[in-house]
Amino acid sequence: VVILKEETTGEIKGFNLFNASKYMELDAQGLVEVTPELAEKIAAALAANGAEVSLDVDFSPKFVVGYVEEKEKHPNADKLSICKVNVGEETLQIVCGAPNVEAGQKVVVAKIGAVMPSGLLIKAGNLRGVDSFGMLCSARELAIPGAPEVKGILVLDTDAEVGSAFVTPTK
C-alpha cells in the first residue's frame, strides 16, 4: 500500500493498493462505482497491509446523466463553449471544448470529486476566465470498451434519466 499525502498539510489524498484483485473482485472495466460493500473491502485490504486509517467515503454518484440546457460561445476562446447542464439536483456551469456539444443533448457529466479512469481528478477550475464545475465526457475518456476514436462528448439516448448515475455499458 502506498498512502498519498498532501505535502504541506499531511492530509491523506489517496491510496494505491497493489494487487487489489487479491482482496476484491471487480467485474467492470472503466468506471467503478464505489459502494458501501466495496469500501468495506478496500478498508479491510488497507488494514491487512498495515494502513491504519478510516475511510470517509462520499457515495453520491460522481458520473451522472446531464441535460445541456444552454450552450454559448466562450468570450475568450474560439474552440470552447460555456454550457449550463442540469444534473438533477442542480445546474452546473461547465466549460467544454467538444466540437459536438449542443443544447438539448443528454450527456455524461463528471462532477467535482470524480476520478476519471485515467486517474484525473475532476475539480472546479477556470478556463480562460470562466469558472467550470465539472466535465462533459467522451466515450474514450470514460474508457468504454470499444469506444470509437472520435472527437467529442458521448451523447446519450433521449430516454436517459437526468441526474441518474452513469454506469459504463457492457457491450
Q: Regions from the language model: what does each represent?
A:
Residues 1-171:
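Phosphate-backbone binding interfaces of nucleic-acid-interacting proteins
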